[in-house]
Each structure stands twice: as structure tokens, then as C-alpha cells.
């Protein structure tokens, strides 16, 4: 009889009793009324801001405080006007405006999908084609340049140089800094650029940072804190409902060998779909995340190769009449996943008149096939080439399932042309998730004897050391972000889903930046979840 492996996963610290104890007063009507009054004041503030730099800085603050979505109509008009004043081919005037203005304008516009050329920075370069050394003392300008460089696309060498130049001088500034606030700002940027950060987590940091500044606007601070607390109250109610649902499934008892990461799965879904009004999509995505985790552990840890082959065939046929061919734990999992998938397809058919069951089924089939391929590699002791591994692993990372599920539950009406675009881009979008996961979990998973990851495959291909392989994977991540900047930000293949698609990369970077933030109770992940779901912002009303 084939022995079963055990990953010895630690139990989640987020049990149902704790989750049900979460409570917030910020769902009350008086807070909603106060928020509306503050929004009116901010709208007036936006209307009265005329200077171009002040407008850009205000929009930047609104975005980082997490409240810009309340004023999108106003901010979009401002950005259209600013972009419309572009002087074709004349970049010298940017030097007069300064590096901070030029870089901030570049980043804010590119974030919104405007085709701002990298040549706007040419006026800050000398005849040799290097950035002028006189810029090395411009702290604000360098931070803005560094942040802007992460909006680059493939082949934009000026922005590559901008990243290297600003990074070099910002690291030196941190070493020599006497102003703690300035040092903290630089360190924050260097740890993770703004373009790759999770919106809600950035808001937590930036509210505290901005509030302590001499130029902080108290109305913006109050609205940001109040809005955060109100959305947190929404998250708490969703999390409590999901925890009750998970308890009722009995999956934790029946699949005791697996990771049961309800709160962590909710953090994933929140990172991808943060908007308070998208609760339906967020909760469905969390359920799907829970199923993915269980299926992953069945293939990676517990199932025998013979059982996994039968499970894969039954998922391919999508036929519950074949359940008796499976052991009990697989029957329970498949039936629950099967019913939930069909239920989601029914709700979409009922509400939108479009049948997506074949799409949803196809995603689970593709995922299970890739899981089975990796299981056969493990059982045969086979190390794939890096290319062979990534072709399978970008799917087994579960990005396509997450992206399509997110699209189906946040988009109305569902557009067939957008679905075709998502099919073209899903694997590439999933690659950042896979590579970030491998960087964070590779060491732990190799200790468990899992299939080699990108790092080990590249080491096997080239004979390089682990650190060189890690640097290679980081370069691959950078390349995928550049591709996403072009394919998603600039080309806008989806009317409203582009930010959500980009968010998959952001939450991936967040979860795995300090190791495996999902597989086990992790101090960094715990800190993030407490800030997002438990602790409200201090505010006096």
C-alpha cells in the first residue's frame, strides 16, 4: 500500500469563534452621513485646485489614501486636461517644471492608461545619455522617478536607466539620512514600489505617514480613516458569513490533512477585489480560493498517484455518477466543488442570461491536469526544464481560475470579446503569481520533497547557485510586470476589469515577499490581516 505524505501544516489562528467575535460600529448610518459631508468638502477642494502640480499631488494623495474612487469623474477630467496639454516632441519644458513634476505626471497618467512617452525624461539626461548627477540630491524627484520607472514597458531603456539611477542614489540617501520621515518614505519605496502594492495595505501605511506631515489636509485624513473603517466593517460581516459557511461544509474535519486558510483566502480575494460594493465577487472568490487550496493539497500531499489519476479523469468528465470510483475524502471534495461551480454558473445564467458552465468546468479541468502533471514529475523523480516547468506551473498557480472567476462575479454584462482577451492574457497574468510563490515557498516545499520549483529547475538547467537562480526569477517577474503594463494598462482589453487583473500580481507580491505567507501562520500575514480586518483607524467624530 502506497504511503501518504504529510506536510504538517499548522492550524490557522483564525478560528470561527474569533472571526464571529469581530464587531464594528462603523456600519451605522451616522458614519455614512458624515462620510457624505466629507466627500462634498473634498469635491470642493478638487474643483478649487488649479495648479497642475497641486492637482497631480492631490490625485496621488487621494489614490494612496484609498479614497480616489469616490471622485473618479472629477479626477478623470483633470487627467484628460493634463494629458491634452502635452507638447508633442517638446520635452525641454519638463526640465523647467522639475523632475518631481515630470515623474509624478508620468506615473499618474500611465496608471490611468495614457500613452506618455519615456522621452519626457530626456531633458534630465546629459549628452552621454546618462541622468545628470545634479539630480542626485533631489530627494522628492528621485522618489518620484523611482516610482515612475515601474510603469515601464518592454524596450523602454530610459526607464530602466531611471530605475537604476534613482535606486542607487536613494540607497545612499537612506545611509546618510538625518530626517527620519524622509528615510521612512525612501525605505518604503525601495521595499516595494507603489505600482506593485496592494491598495488597502498601502492606505494603512500612507494614512499614518501623510497624517504626520506638515502639509496634511485634515479633511482628507478624516475621510480616509472613516472610509477605511466603514469598508472594514463590510469585510468583517463578509468574513463572518464565510466562516459560518465553511464550518457548515465539514471540509475541515473531512480533509484534516489540508491547509484550512479561510481568513488568508479572504485576504487574497480582498487584494484582488477590494471595492466595498463588490462583496458578491469577493465572497465567491474566497470560496474558490478555499477549493483551490484543498485541491492543491490533495495533489501535492495526500493523494496517491492512482487516486489522482482517477480524480483528474472524473473532473475532466464532470460527472458525479462516477463518484464511487473515488475514496471518501475525494468524493466529499469533488461533490462540494462540483455543486458550488454549478451554483455560480446558475446565478450568472439567471442574472445575465449567459451560460458559463463550460468556461468554469474548463478552468478546473486545466488546473487538475497541471496538478496531475506535477504529481507525476514528483513520483517519477523528474526535474523538468525551466520552460517545461513554467508552461505547467503558470496554470497550477491557479491564476486562470482566479481571474475568470473574478471577471464573472464583478462584470455585468459579461462581454464575449473581453472573455477572449482574458483567455489570451490569463496565463501571462498568472506568471507573476507563480514566480512570486516560488520565491517565497521554494525552500519550505523542497524540504517537504515537493516537485522542483522555478529556482531548482533553473539551477538544474544552468548549474548556477541558488542566489543566481533567485535573481533570474526576479528578472522574470520584472519582465512580466512590463508585459502587463503594456497588455493591460495601455491596451485596456477590458472595460472595467483591468485594475482587478493587475491586482492578482499585487496580492501575489504581498503574500510572498517575506516567505510563505499562505501555507503557515506567518507573522507578516497576520499583521496585515489584523490591520485590515480587526483594528479600526483611530478617529474622533
Swiss-Prot record:
EC number: 4.2.3.65
Pfam families reported for this sequence: Terpene_synth (PF01397), Terpene_synth_C (PF03936)
Residues the entry annotates as binding Mg(2+) 1: 296, 300
GO biological process, alphabetically ordered: diterpenoid biosynthetic process
Coiled coil: none
Binding of Mg(2+) 2, residues: 296, 300
Pathway: Secondary metabolite biosynthesis; terpenoid biosynthesis
Domain notes: The Asp-Asp-Xaa-Xaa-Asp/Glu (DDXXD/E) motif is important for the catalytic activity, presumably through binding to Mg(2+).
Listed cofactors: Mg(2+); Mn(2+)
Catalysed reaction, written as an equation: (2E,6E)-farnesyl diphosphate = alpha-zingiberene + diphosphate
Entry's Gene Ontology molecular function annotations: alpha-zingiberene synthase activity; magnesium ion binding; terpene synthase activity
Similarity comment: Belongs to the terpene synthase family.
Name the UniProt record assigns to this protein: Alpha-zingiberene synthase
Amino acid at each position: 500500500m502506497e504511503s501518504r505524505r504529510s506536510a504538517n501544516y499548522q492550524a490557522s489562528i483564525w478560528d470561527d469563534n474569533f472571526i464571529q467575535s469581530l464587531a464594528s460600529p462603523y456600519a451605522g448610518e451616522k458614519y455614512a452621513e458624515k462620510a457624505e459631508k466629507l466627500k462634498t468638502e473634498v469635491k470642493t477642494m478638487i474643483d478649487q485646485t488649479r495648479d497642475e502640480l497641486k492637482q497631480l499631488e492631490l490625485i496621488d494623495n487621494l489614490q494612496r489614501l484609498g479614497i480616489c474612487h469616490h471622485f473618479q469623474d472629477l479626477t478623470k477630467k483633470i487627467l484628460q486636461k493634463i494629458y491634452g496639454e502635452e507638447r508633442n516632441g517638446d520635452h525641454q519644458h519638463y526640465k523647467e517644471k522639475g523632475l518631481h513634476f515630470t515623474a509624478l505626471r508620468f506615473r499618474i497618467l500611465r496608471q490611468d492608461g495614457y500613452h506618455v512617452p519615456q522621452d519626457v525624461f530626456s531633458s534630465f539626461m546629459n549628452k552621454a545619455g546618462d541622468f545628470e548627477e545634479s539630480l542626485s540630491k533631489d530627494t522628492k524627484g528621485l522618489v518620484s522617478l523611482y516610482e515612475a520607472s515601474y510603469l515601464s514597458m518592454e524596450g523602454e531603456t530610459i526607464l530602466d536607466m531611471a530605475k537604476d539611477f534613482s535606486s542607487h542614489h536613494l540607497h545612499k540617501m537612506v545611509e546618510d539620512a538625518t530626517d527620519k520621515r524622509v528615510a521612512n518614505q525612501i525605505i518604503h519605496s525601495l521595499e516595494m514600489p507603489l505600482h506593485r502594492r496592494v491598495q488597502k495595505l498601502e492606505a494603512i501605511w500612507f494614512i499614518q505617514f501623510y497624517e504626520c506631515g506638515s502639509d496634511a489636509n485634515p479633511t482628507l485624513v478624516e475621510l480616509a480613516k472613516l472610509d477605511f473603517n466603514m469598508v472594514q466593517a463590510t469585510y468583517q460581516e463578509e468574513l463572518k458569513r464565510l466562516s459560518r459557511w465553511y464550518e457548515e461544509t465539514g471540509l475541515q474535519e473531512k480533509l484534516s490533512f489540508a491547509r484550512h486558510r479561510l481568513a488568508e483566502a479572504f485576504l487574497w480575494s480582498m487584494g484582488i477585489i477590494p471595492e466595498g460594493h463588490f462583496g458578491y465577487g469577493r465572497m465567491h472568490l474566497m470560496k474558490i480560493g478555499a477549493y483551490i487550496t484543498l485541491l492543491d493539497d490533495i495533489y501535492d500531499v495526500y493523494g496517491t498517484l492512482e487516486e489522482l489519476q482517477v480524480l483528474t479523469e472524473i473532473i475532466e468528465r464532470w460527472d458525479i455518477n462516477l463518484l464511487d470510483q473515488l475514496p471518501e475524502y475525494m468524493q466529499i471534495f469533488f461533490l462540494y466543488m462540483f455543486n458550488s461551480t454549478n451554483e455560480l454558473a446558475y446565478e450568472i445564467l439567471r442574472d445575465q442570461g449567459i451560460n458559463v458552465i463550460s468556461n468554469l468546468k474548463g478552468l478546473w479541468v486545466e488546473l487538475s491536469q497541471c496538478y496531475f502533471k506535477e504529481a507525476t514529475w514528483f513520483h517519477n523523480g523528474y526535474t523538468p526544464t525551466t520552460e517545461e516547468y513554467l508552461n505547467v506551473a503558470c496554470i497550477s498557480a491557479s491564476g486562470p481560475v482566479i481571474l475568470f472567476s473574478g471577471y464573472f462575479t464583478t462584470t455585468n454584462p459579461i462581454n464575449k470579446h473581453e472573455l477572449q482577451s482574458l483567455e489570451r492574457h490569463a496565463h501571462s497574468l498568472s506568471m507573476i503569481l507563480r514566480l512570486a510563490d516560488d520565491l517565497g515557498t521554494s525552500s519550505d516545499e523542497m524540504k517537504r520533497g515537493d516537485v522542483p520549483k522555478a529556482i531548482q529547475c533553473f539551477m538544474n538547467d544552468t548549474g548556477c547557485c541558488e542566489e543566481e537562480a533567485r535573481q533570474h526569477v526576479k528578472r522574470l517577474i520584472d519582465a512580466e510586470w512590463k508585459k502587463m503594463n503594456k497588455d493591460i494598462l495601455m491596451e485596456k482589453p477590458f472595460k472595467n476589469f483591468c485594475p482587478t487583473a493587475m491586482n492578482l500580481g499585487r496580492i501575489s507580491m504581498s503574500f510572498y515577499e517575506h516567505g510563505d505567507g499562505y501555507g503557515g501562520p506567518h507573522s507578516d500575514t497576520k499583521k496585515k490581516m489584523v490591520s485590515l480586518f480587526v483594528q479600526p483607524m483611530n478617529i474622533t467624530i
